[in-house]
Amino acid sequence: MEARELSLRYGPKTAIHKVSLAILDRRVTALIGPSGCGKSTFLRSLNRMNDLISGTTHSGTILLDGTDIHDRGVDVVDLRRRVGMVFQKSNPFPKSIFENVAYGLRVGGMKDKAELATRVEKSLRGAALWDEVKDRLDESALGLSGGQQQRLCIARAMAVEPEVLLMDEPASALDPIATAKIEELIHELKSTYTIAIVTHNMQQAARVSDRTAFFYMGELVECGPTEQIFTNPREKRTEDYVTGKFG
């Protein structure tokens, strides 16, 4: 997946300006930068979530398997199936654990009970949650802990078999133990999925990502291998940010 010269405006305000960035297959790309720098706006652009905000306009292109996701013929619902999203705050539906994961499958037309059960189990196993919930699938998802709810949301995104997973600060509201489980899960998921993650946590970016992109004031300042970004960045602004001189 790749953005080329992508700019996005909310009304008259430019949120990101001419960003060109490739999200490499089966790698984790971390998007870092101070609050308001455009990293979450960029992330939401990758599956057109910004379309839901009134007054949003864009220029440039975003390619998924060589096709511009803004082409007239693109089915936005299918795009969001192919490019799944996990939000900062876990958002389980007020349904059972099983129905949370099955929701997207049912919307997509899957009706066979055995097939649904197989896909739900596969997704919960993939999200490292199955062993914790297998005996209470009919219970409300709202009864899960915060960390479990976030992994449930990851399972729900995985159930429809996306190609790309977008994560907007998925562990920011979690305690250290739950955060460690999410980070371990991200390591496991990258063998199957292309992942882009927004994080304010520099240590987390260093731990989970293969590549890191630094945004500042709506522009992409620098992108490269994570180790290089944190130990030998090319740009002084990047160095100042990762060493804590501003944030």
From Swiss-Prot:
Catalyses which reaction(s): phosphate(out) + ATP + H2O = ADP + 2 phosphate(in) + H(+)
Residues that, per the record, bind ATP: G33, P34, S35, G36, C37, G38, K39, S40
Catalytic class of the enzyme: translocase
EC code(s) of this entry: 7.3.2.1
ATP-binding listed as a keyword: yes
Gene Ontology annotations for the cellular component aspect, listed alphabetically: plasma membrane
Compartments, record wording: Cell inner membrane
One Pfam family per UniProt: ABC_tran
Superkingdom of the organism of origin: Bacteria
Chief subcellular location: membrane
One GO biological process term: phosphate ion transmembrane transport
Residue stretches making up the ABC transporter domain: 1-242
Molecular function GO terms recorded: ATP binding; ATP hydrolysis activity; ATPase-coupled phosphate ion transmembrane transporter activity
Annotated Gene3D superfamilies: P-loop containing nucleotide triphosphate hydrolases
SMART domains cross-referenced by the UniProt entry: AAA
Membrane topology value: Peripheral membrane protein
UniProt keyword terms in alphabetical order: ATP-binding, Cell inner membrane, Cell membrane, Membrane, Nucleotide-binding, Phosphate transport, Translocase, Transport
Quaternary structure and partners: The complex is composed of two ATP-binding proteins (PstB), two transmembrane proteins (PstC and PstA) and a solute-binding protein (PstS).
Family membership noted in the UniProt record: Belongs to the ABC transporter superfamily. Phosphate importer (TC 3.A.1.7) family.
PANTHER family hit by this protein: ABC TRANSPORTER I FAMILY MEMBER 17 (PTHR43423:SF1)
Function: Part of the ABC transporter complex PstSACB involved in phosphate import. Responsible for energy coupling to the transport system.
Name of the featured protein: Phosphate import ATP-binding protein PstB
Annotated source species: Myxococcus xanthus (strain DK1622)
